[in-house]
């Protein structure tokens, strides 16, 4: 469904102020029946009481729950339904975002009696006379030869957790380890390696090999590590980002990808690429920060764990974080002077449509700018992560894999994050896309067109959503 969400560069030629971005509609998980147990849970860092908030009104109402009776009523209803679902089914049944996408696709597959094998990794592709004829799949303790009538689609989620390929393609992580991805840990580049063994080419020439996102590292209640992507908080009024030198370096309200590129450009050679989000008590309790929730939820656990740094003064906060105190105080003083008039002469925070959309519409005159003046003060460390990889298998316009000489490999297709992305220097907008292919080709979602003009499958595809990730070794249907 369309959103009023603006393009990331809405002011650029051809940019749109809203209405072009698409998101999945919420999906009732009860439609999956007993198979709901196979659907991965949302990332804990992106949930509220276990609820994955959908893009749009969900986030708006939850952010305004203490300021609006209408929002408070909406949140109360949403929470009541969620806890009732948990009591009855063991999990929430209002699926949003990636969960809704995976759930709808799975429901369509089950309705068509399409078998879906979980925990069944591909061992190798079957190649005969230069064409891919199928795959050897490990299932129930034995290898099974699966032959394909028309072709094999590789859609294994890219390589966000392939340390060797990260080392080669991520300039900010020369040893492959200084990078954190919230993506499934099973996405280790299996599809790319399978393609290479079959003669395919992985394009590693892109200026950005992934969709960069600033993340913070937290410890979950069960002791495991969590990776929190920072999408919304950076744009809020009363929140800025600084380097260890105590200076701002970018418009904090810009897209996650642009923000990380600024992080990389600002870093000195050989030093850790990290920055700190800074805010005061008023902003923290009004909007939250990273994994830290807004009022009325408690924040003590995050302070005790060290995830959230707190200081009674800016100099005390600087001492805890290693930020240069004098420079930080100067930066805040300069910000506060301009913020009283709703201006940001240094970086123009709030000057772009995307900034304003992610800010606070109830705050004026600039929805992204406010003084940082109410102690105590807080900081969270940000490092570099990704939302998915861009470098991938080189294909033609019909998703057919190409070899090193640009020739089609018969029977082999790539989709989603296994396919080389159509952009890499920057990200123009948040989108879902679908493609119609010739009768001889298969779409990224695995839908066959039996003859020219046969659009029945495409209509079903559009009605249920579209997917870009199906891992060869993940034990669940979907997660995010």
Across the structure, where does each feature detected by a protein language model lie?
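Conserved redox-cofactor binding core of oxidoreductases
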Residues: 1-140, 163-164, 213-217, 332, ...
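An anion/pyrophosphate-binding glycine-rich loop and adjacent beta-alpha core
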Residues: 7-74, 192-194, 198-323, 327
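Glycine-rich loop(s) and the adjacent beta-strand/alpha-helix scaffold that form part
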Residues: 92-99, 111, 139-218, 434, ...
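A glycine-rich dinucleotide-binding beta-alpha-beta segment and adjacent secondary-structure elements
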Residues: 124, 131, 327-422, 426
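C-terminal structured subdomain/cap of oxidoreductase catalytic cores
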Residues: 144-145, 149-151, 288-294, 387-454
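Short Gly/Pro-enriched turn/cap motifs at secondary-structure boundaries
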Residues: 182, 228-233, 254, 382-392
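Internal hydrophobic alpha-helix adjacent to the cofactor/substrate pocket in enzyme cavities
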Residues: 194-201, 321, 329, 436-456
């Amino acid at each position: 469904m369309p959103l009023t969400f603006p393009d990331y560069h809405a002011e650029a030629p051809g940019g749109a102020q809203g209405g072009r971005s698409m998101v999945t509609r919420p999906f009732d998980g009860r439609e999956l029946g007993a198979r709901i147990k196979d659907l991965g849970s949302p990332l804990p860092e992106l949930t509220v009481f276990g609820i994955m908030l959908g893009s749009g009104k969900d986030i708006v109402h939850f952010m305004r729950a203490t300021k609006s009776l209408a929002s408070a009523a909406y949140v109360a209803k949403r929470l009541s339904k969620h806890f009732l679902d948990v009591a009855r089914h063991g999990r929430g049944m209002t699926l949003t975002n990636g969960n809704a996408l995976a759930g709808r696709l799975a429901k369509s597959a089950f309705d068509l009696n399409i078998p879906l094998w979980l925990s069944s990794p591909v061992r190798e592709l079957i190649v005969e006379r230069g064409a891919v004829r199928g795959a050897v799949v490990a299932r129930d303790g034995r290898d099974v030869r699966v032959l394909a009538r028309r072709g094999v689609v590789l859609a294994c989620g890219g390589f966000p957790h392939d340390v060797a390929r990260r080392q080669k393609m991520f300039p900010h992580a020369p040893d492959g380890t200084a990078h954190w991805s919230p993506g499934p840990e099973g996405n280790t580049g299996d599809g790319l390696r399978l393609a290479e063994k079959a003669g395919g080419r992985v394009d590693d020439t892109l200026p950005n090999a992934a969709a960069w996102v600033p993340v913070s590292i937290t410890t979950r209640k069960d002791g495991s590590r969590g990776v929190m992507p920072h999408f919304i908080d950076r744009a809020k009024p009363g929140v800025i980002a600084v380097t260890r030198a105590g200076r701002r370096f970018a418009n904090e309200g810009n897209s996650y990808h642009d923000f990380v590129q600024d992080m990389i450009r600002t870093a000195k050679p050989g030093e850790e690429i990290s920055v700190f989000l800074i805010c005061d008590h008023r902003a923290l309790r009004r909007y939250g920060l990273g994994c830290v929730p807004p009022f009325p939820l408690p924040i003590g656990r995050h302070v005790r764990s060290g995830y959230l740094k707190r200081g009674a003064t800016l100099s005390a906060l600087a001492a805890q974080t290693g930020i240069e105190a004098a420079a930080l105080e100067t930066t805040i003083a300069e910000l506060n002077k301009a913020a009283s008039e709703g201006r940001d002469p240094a970086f123009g925070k709030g000057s772009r449509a995307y900034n304003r959309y992610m800010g606070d519409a109830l705050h004026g005159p600039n929805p992204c700018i406010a003084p940082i003046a109410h102690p105590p003060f807080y900081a969270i460390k940000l490092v570099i992560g990704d939302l998915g990889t861009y470098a991938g298998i080189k294909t033609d316009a019909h998703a057919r894999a190409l070899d090193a000489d640009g020739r089609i490999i018969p029977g082999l297709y790539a989709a989603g994050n296994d396919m080389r992305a159509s952009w890499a220097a920057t990200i123009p907008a948040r989108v879902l896309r679908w493609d119609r292919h010739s009768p001889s080709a298969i779409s990224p979602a695995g839908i066959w067109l039996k003859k020219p003009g046969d659009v029945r499958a495409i209509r079903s595809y559009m009605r249920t959503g579209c997917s870009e990730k199906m891992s060869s070794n993940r034990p669940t249907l979907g997660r995010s």
